[in-house]
């Protein structure tokens, strides 16, 4: 009999607080996690106004804090924040903002072996609780290994103040899990790729939960934020279990990353993934109309025109998608789509 040698490490958020005025308990969360007394707040100008200043004021009596203002998650900004953290001799970090501030903190936390608390001010994607980060460069966005936050404080009051477009984008990103899971299942059949059933089911729960509540997710309703936060966090946790982004990222994300290369900074990540999921579910011969109807109910875009892309952008991205992550087997296969097939796919799903 062969000797069993398998071993795996998984890191999850330990303290998750969701709800109305949740940041009022930031000191309690940090004390319960026993971080030490020297902290760094990583934020941006707008997100500092949204939540950073209040966190700073609430913690200043008990902690030696330094606030760092930064921008997009680029290698340069990661290095700058890392140097500031080391200079302050910080024992923990607080990431206050949208995706970029949390992504920077994830990478720095991994590099320096430091705990951090994620305090999202908007939820335009499902990365709040995951151990992956999106690092931007001139050639587009790259998913890199990082570390999940030790704690999460999701203040529904704060998040509800952000533009509703961000919330709808986060929902679309989680809904797109359905095609990622189809791709993962397909790869396990075709290539014997290992598939985690627990990560699979958690990711599926997250997507189905948002679809089932799609008619209750509306602009200006704090309850809408409450409804989606658990699925968004669960989606991130599924990646922690799998040890990669497979439960939440497949052909629809490859399409999205191709759009980032073709026409960067045109639409939000989740918006692009939602549109990609409509088309990729059609390739899987699944219920793509259910995805589209759910996105429409939420208020997320389902067409090129709604997101600022041209018909050629969509077609070019569909053709390019197969080359984004060649090691990841999806419904696109090795050869991908011809331009004619891509055009037909986008038209039959009414993306163009």
Show which residues each predicted segment covers:
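ATP/NTP phosphate-donor binding region
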Residues: 1-92
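C-terminal charged capping/lid subdomain of soluble metabolic enzymes
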Residues: 2-7, 11, 174, 285-352
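Solvent-exposed alpha-helices and their adjacent loops that cap or buttress functional pockets
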Residues: 8-10, 33-34, 85-88, 109, ...
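A glycine/threonine-rich phosphate-anchoring loop and its flanking beta-alpha core
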Residues: 14, 111-206
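Short glycine/serine/threonine-rich phosphate/pyrophosphate-binding segments
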Residues: 48-51, 100-106, 125-128, 248
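A short, small-residue-rich loop immediately preceding and capping a beta-strand
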Residues: 85-108, 112-123
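Active-site segments that bind and position negatively charged phosphate/pyrophosphate groups
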Residues: 197-298, 302-309
């Amino acid at each position: 009999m062969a000797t069993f040698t398998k071993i795996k490490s998984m890191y999850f958020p330990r303290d998750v607080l969701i709800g109305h005025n949740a940041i009022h308990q930031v000191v309690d969360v940090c004390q319960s996690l026993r971080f030490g007394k020297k902290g760094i707040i990583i934020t941006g100008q707008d997100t500092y106004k949204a939540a950073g200043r209040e966190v700073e004021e609430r913690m200043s009596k008990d902690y030696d804090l330094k606030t760092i203002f930064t921008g997009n998650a680029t290698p340069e900004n990661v290095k700058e924040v890392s140097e500031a953290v080391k200079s302050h001799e910080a024992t923990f970090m607080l990431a206050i903002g949208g995706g970029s501030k949390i992504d920077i903190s994830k990478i720095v936390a991994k590099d320096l072996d430091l705990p951090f608390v994620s305090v999202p001010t908007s939820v335009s994607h499902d990365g709040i609780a995951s151990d992956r980060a999106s690092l931007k460069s001139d050639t587009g966005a790259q998913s890199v290994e990082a570390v999940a936050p030790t704690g999460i404080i999701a203040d529904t009051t704060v998040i509800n103040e952000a533009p509703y477009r961000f919330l709808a984008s986060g929902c679309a990103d989680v809904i797109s899990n359905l095609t990622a899971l189809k791709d993962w299942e397909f790869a396990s059949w075709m290539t014997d790729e290992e598939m985690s059933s627990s990560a699979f089911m958690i990711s599926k729960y997250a997507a189905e939960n948002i679809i089932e509540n799609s008619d209750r997710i509306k602009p200006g309703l704090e309850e809408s934020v409450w409804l989606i936060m658990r699925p968004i966090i669960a989606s991130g946790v599924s990646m922690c279990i799998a040890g990669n982004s497979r439960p939440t990222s497949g052909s629809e994300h490859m399409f999205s990353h191709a759009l980032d290369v073709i026409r960067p900074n045109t639409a939000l990540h989740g918006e692009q993934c939602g549109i990609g999921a409509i088309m990729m579910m059609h390739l899987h011969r699944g219920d793509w109309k259910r995805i589209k109807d759910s996105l429409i109910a939420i208020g997320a875009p389902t067409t090129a025109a709604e997101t600022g892309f041209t018909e050629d952008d969509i077609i070019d991205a569909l053709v390019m998608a197969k080359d984004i992550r060649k090691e990841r087997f999806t419904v696109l296969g090795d050869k991908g789509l011809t331009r004619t097939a891509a055009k037909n796919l986008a038209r039959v799903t009414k993306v163009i």
